[in-house]
UniProtKB/Swiss-Prot annotation:
It is found in: Cell inner membrane. PANTHER family: ATP SYNTHASE GAMMA CHAIN, ATP SYNTHASE SUBUNIT GAMMA, MITOCHONDRIAL. This is ATP synthase gamma chain. GO terms for cellular component: plasma membrane; proton-transporting ATP synthase complex. It comes from Nitrosococcus oceani (strain ATCC 19707 / BCRC 17464 / JCM 30415 / NCIMB 11848 / C-107).
Length: 289
């Protein structure tokens, strides 16, 4: 059995660790709420752009933009969103496992995969894994802006425009609630055909006056739409990261508390054994006299 001094040292060490995990839990909770606010604020923008695209596509069906046109998949691309830091449970691992399964399915069809990485964890993992990485963006912080993503996303959009990639997907963690984060793989390009389907409300073919031309507006709006979806995925992944970290740090704090209780019990037993031994020695010495 360890001595009382050693056990006291362990108790002090675990208590210090518990203070750190509790502080990290509170910081993660605060950052999660801020990320949720950004996540909710970005949704109306994406929804409004989607409506504009839908209207433009229906009112000008003679213009077949490449982003709205489906073609045979000879090569696919994935924009992968992960965290820059760890200590967030199995958040990244679950996403990577889902991705590897999907990538394996494409590989079995003889379709190569190209990757665009957002986040240090995905960058490290897929460089070890041996994936073909076309672009990357890391260390964006807890409050990224759309401008931080434009250059990285443009690489994949150019690849799609030039025919080097025939499908483009976004892989990120979807925020369900504080306790649940779900890996999600969402198709970005070609944009869902439902966007171009005829709507009964637009049968009368009313339209806006565009400056510049509707074709140029659609070209720009489609790019902004994809950028907004990627940004939405990034801020949602940050909310997932902070929620997972908060839960992980709470579990660590609780485990530290249980460990401290066990160590305290061991210390009490060691102290009791030492007192009993001293009493036995005193009694033995008195009997010898």
């Amino acid at each position: 059995m360890a001595s009382g001094k050693e056990i006291r040292s362990k108790i002090a060490s675990v208590k210090n660790t518990q203070k750190i995990t509790r502080a990290m839990e509170m910081v993660a909770a605060s950052k999660m709420r801020k990320a949720q606010d950004r996540m909710r604020a970005s949704r109306p923008y994406a929804d409004k752009i989607r409506n504009v695209i839908r209207h433009l596509a229906q009112a000008h069906q003679e213009y077949q933009h490449p982003y709205l046109t489906s073609r045979e998949a000879k090569k696919v691309g994935f924009i992968i969103v992960s965290s820059d830091r760890g200590l967030c449970g199995g958040l990244n691992t679950n996403l990577f496992r889902t991705l590897l399964r999907t990538m394996r399915e494409w590989d079995e069809k003889g379709v190569p995969v190209e990757l665009c990485i957002i986040g240090q964890k995905a960058n490290a993992f897929f460089r070890r894994f041996g994936g073909s990485i076309a672009a990357q963006a890391t260390h964006l912080g807890d409050s990224p802006h759309v401008e931080d993503l434009i250059g990285t996303v443009k690489v994949m959009l150019d690849n799609y425009q030039e025919g080097n990639v025939d499908r483009l997907y976004l892989a990120f963690n979807e925020f369900v609630n504080t306790m649940t984060q779900r890996p999600e793989i969402e198709q970005l390009l070609p944009i869902d055909a439902n966007v171009g389907k005829t709507d009964e409300k637009l049968e009368h073919r009313w339209d806006y006056l565009y400056e510049p031309e509707a074709k140029e507006v659609l070209d720009q709006v489609l790019i902004r739409y994809i950028e907004s979806l990627v940004y939405q995925g990034v801020v949602e992944n940050i909310a997932c990261e902070q929620a997972a970290r908060m839960v992980a740090m709470k579990a660590a704090s609780d485990n530290a508390g249980g460990f401290i209780d066990d160590l305290q019990l061991a210390y009490n037993k060691a102290r009791q054994a030492a007192i009993t031994q001293e009493l036995s020695e005193i009694v033995g010495g008195a009997a010898a006299l």
